[in-house]
């Protein structure tokens, strides 16, 4: 399953050079291509780090060492939930932050006259599921037929490598920039967004923000809102020989699943923004985890499930929370047991409102022009049915943010992989963007 809506075209960049405006830009692109092995090697080293929730330290260390080796000035930004708690974008989480951190690399401006840029990418990855279902161990990355396989290969460590080396390419080609550039590698993108938020709270922003999410060489203009929630239920335990006298908490989840599915259907049909009207089912409910019971021969007294639900731009987090709580309450009131033992709803993790962007923003226009210089045609718009860290920059900074990234398949699934030529396309486009947006200095 690919995240990219189109067909990727392998571009002959000797022909594409005809669209590039000057010799300086041609030299930059040639330098990017000379760094192909470095970009792939960096991706392999990042993917080899199993940076699931709470285990990101290895990947962060690899990132920090690479930035320092390439001459960036680095700063660690701790993920401190207590310090972030008062921020309107903060997402409460039940897990501890400990000493976990994000890492920032900076290249200062060498002159004035350009506009600042920030590249953001996340180092955390989702769990690999059942490793035995993979062709190879998920954190032993390998390359086959132009694709790099491994958990996080597409989502989104290859993009992190591409954005890092796009900045380095200008330095290697002998060019400075007339505005500062920030490379930002964060954690908790997959669950809360607090990593990117911590960097924003620390003062890191720019006039343009590019995120190489694996949606292909497209320009993201719209994304849905997303939230997580947990529903806990109580039953009445008993030995199975007297099962009818007990109340099975796990089975009491079933009508709630049905009610939430009905809510999902209603949300997909109500106040649909123009960008989503041609989509068959843009909003999705996922019952992602279920827990309950402690013995096969005991009617379970407790059960809970965790879910993710998306909602359209224009609906805010508080409103959708109220709708979910109302849906659960109305369903429970129809059950003789649940109406006296109401399910408990807890919201945690993502509280991410959706948003829409104009393609006419100068940063998006410049990015599109760079894409056209390399491909000869305009980049497609991407209408996202998931959330990204883009939302934090949209809501809490004055940046012009979007996503433009490589082509990946099976993200969050088995045998996740990324197309390596598309990774190089990202690096070329980003380097060209820096030259035009930040302006060259030599």
Model-derived segments and their meaning:
Residues 1-19:
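N-terminal amphipathic/basic-hydrophobic helices that include classical n-h-c signal peptides
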Residues 18-27, 34, 69, 230-442:
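Metal-dependent amide/peptide-bond hydrolase catalytic core
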Residues 18-148, 177:
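Acidic/His- and Gly-rich active-site-bordering loop/insert found
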Residues 93-97, 220-223, 276-279, 381-383:
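Short Gly/Pro-enriched turn/cap motifs at secondary-structure boundaries
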Residues 128-143, 221-232, 370, 402:
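Acidic-glycine-rich active-site phosphate/pyrophosphate-binding loop
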Residues 133, 176, 220-226, 296-300, ...:
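Short glycine/proline-enriched loop/turn "hinge" motifs that connect secondary-structure elements
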Residues 148, 156-228, 438, 442:
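Acidic/histidine-rich catalytic neighborhood of metal-dependent amide-processing enzymes
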Residues 148-161, 186, 247-251, 417-424:
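Short, conserved micro-motifs enriched in small and acidic residues
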């Amino acid at each position: 399953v690919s995240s990219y809506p189109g067909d990727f075209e392998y571009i002959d960049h000797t022909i594409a050079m005809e669209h590039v405006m000057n010799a300086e830009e041609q030299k930059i692109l040639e330098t990017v291509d000379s760094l192909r092995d470095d970009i792939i090697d960096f991706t392999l080293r990042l993917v080899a780090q199993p940076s699931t929730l709470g285990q990101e330290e290895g990947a962060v260390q690899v990132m920090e060492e690479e930035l320092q080796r390439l001459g960036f000035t680095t700063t660690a930004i701790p993920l401190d939930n207590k310090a972030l708690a008062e921020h309107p974008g903060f997402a409460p989480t039940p897990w501890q932050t400990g000493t976990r951190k994000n890492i920032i690399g900076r290249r200062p401006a060498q002159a004035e006259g350009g506009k600042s840029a920030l590249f953001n990418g996340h180092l955390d990855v989702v769990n690999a599921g059942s490793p035995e279902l993979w062709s190879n161990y998920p954190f032993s990355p390998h390359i086959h037929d132009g694709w790099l396989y491994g958990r996080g290969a597409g989502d989104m460590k290859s993009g992190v490598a591409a954005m890092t080396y796009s900045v380095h390419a200008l330095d290697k080609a002998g060019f400075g920039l007339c505005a500062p550039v920030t490379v930002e590698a964060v954690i908790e993108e997959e669950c809360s967004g607090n990593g990117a938020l911590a960097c924003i709270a620390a003062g890191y922003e720019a006039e343009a923000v590019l995120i190489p999410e694996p949606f292909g060489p497209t320009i993201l203009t719209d994304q849905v809102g997303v939230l997580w929630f947990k529903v806990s239920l109580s039953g009445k335990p008993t030995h199975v020989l007297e099962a009818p006298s007990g109340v099975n908490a796990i089975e009491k989840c079933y009508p709630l699943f049905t009610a939430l599915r009905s809510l999902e259907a209603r949300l997909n049909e109500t106040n649909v923004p123009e960008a989503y009207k041609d989509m068959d089912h843009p909003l999705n409910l996922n019952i992602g985890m279920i827990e309950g019971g402690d013995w096969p021969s005991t009617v379970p007294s407790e059960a809970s499930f965790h879910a993710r639900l998306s909602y359209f731009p224009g609906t805010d987090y508080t409103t959708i929370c109220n709708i979910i709580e109302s849906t659960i309450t109305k369903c429970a009131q129809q059950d003789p047991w649940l109406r006296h033992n109401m399910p408990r709803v807890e919201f945690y993790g993502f509280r991410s409102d959706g948003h829409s962007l104009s393609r006419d923003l100068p940063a998006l226009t410049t990015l599109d022009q760079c894409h056209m210089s390399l491909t000869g045609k305009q980049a497609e718009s991407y209408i996202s049915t998931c959330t990204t860290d883009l939302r934090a920059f949209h809501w809490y900074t004055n940046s012009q943010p979007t996503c433009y990234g490589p082509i990946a398949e099976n993200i969050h699934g088995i045998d996740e992989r990324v197309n390596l030529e598309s990774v190089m396309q990202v690096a070329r486009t980003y380097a060209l963007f820096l030259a035009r947006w930040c302006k060259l200095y030599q």
